[in-house]
């Protein structure tokens, strides 16, 4: 319970800083962060994710986004962030134009380089496969890490959820999973290697004790 509270507090703080109009004013960050955070908190509490719970999380995320955008739209035009301006565009019937333009920007970045166009979906599918079957593809060290740190696997799944949503809804889409991987992959390798080293030390200590 304490772990879930700690994760929720840190995560909500990050969402607030990222999405608050007077700070980050990021329209694409909170909708990507909240579902991953919700999944992680539920997983720590032992609550199984279902389609219904996923739909509720999506609805709450969309509602909070619209609420923040609405509150920002109440400020003076010169003080509004793009969240408030987006809400005003919804009232004016121009929101779809913005969504289409951002989608086109994302697609142009993705398909402007065919290597990236192939790499991103393949990489996401590979990560999903490894998380589903962590003993495959030589990743037994990852399974051992999952065994020694029960929150590691839910954390990686939450990260995957956040990066995937961020990839889909941001106009800089392909940069989201790329930057996330730059941070996550070295940390994952460090955890896996640390687990193997701990096991090696324990094995060595056991053998030394038997020889005495």
Which ranges hold each PLM region?
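Membrane-interfacial, low-structure loops and terminal tails that flank and connect transmembrane helices
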Residues: 1-2, 135-150, 201-212
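Membrane-interfacial entry segments at the cytosolic side of transmembrane helices
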Residues: 2-3, 46-59
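Hydrophobic membrane-spanning alpha-helices of multi-pass integral membrane proteins
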Residues: 6-15, 33-37, 58-65, 93-97, ...
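Membrane-interface helix caps and helix-loop-helix hairpins in membrane proteins
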Residues: 18-27, 168-175
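Aromatic-rich transmembrane-lumenal/periplasmic boundary elements in polytopic membrane proteins
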Residues: 28, 54-92
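Alpha-helical transmembrane segments
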Residues: 40-44, 66-70, 125-136, 187-200
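Juxtamembrane membrane-water interface segments that cap and precede transmembrane helices
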Residues: 91-114
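Alpha-helical transmembrane segments at the extracellular/periplasmic loop-to-helix junctions
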Residues: 108-135
């Amino acid at each position: 319970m304490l772990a879930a509270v700690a994760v929720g507090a840190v995560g909500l703080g990050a969402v607030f800083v990222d999405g608050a109009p007077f700070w980050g004013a990021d329209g694409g960050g909170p909708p990507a962060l909240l579902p991953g955070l919700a999944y992680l908190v539920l997983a720590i509490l032992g609550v199984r994710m279902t389609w219904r719970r996923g739909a509720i999380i999506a609805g709450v995320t969309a509602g909070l986004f619209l609420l923040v955008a609405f509150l920002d739209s109440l400020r003076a035009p010169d003080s509004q962030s793009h969240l408030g301006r987006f809400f005003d565009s919804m009232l004016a019937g121009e929101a779809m134009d913005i969504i289409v333009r951002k989608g086109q920007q994302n697609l142009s970045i993705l398909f402007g380089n065919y290597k990236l166009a192939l790499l991103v979906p393949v990489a996401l599918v590979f990560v999903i496969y490894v998380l589903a079957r962590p003993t495959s593809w030589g990743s037994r060290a990852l399974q051992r890490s999952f065994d020694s740190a029960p929150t590691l696997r839910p954390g990686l799944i939450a990260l995957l959820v956040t990066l995937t949503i961020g990839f889909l809804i941001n106009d800089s889409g392909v940069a989201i999973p790329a930057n996330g991987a730059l941070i996550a992959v070295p940390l994952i390798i460090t955890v896996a290697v640390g687990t193997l080293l701990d096991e090696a030390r324990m094995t060595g200590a056991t053998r030394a004790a038997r020889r005495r």
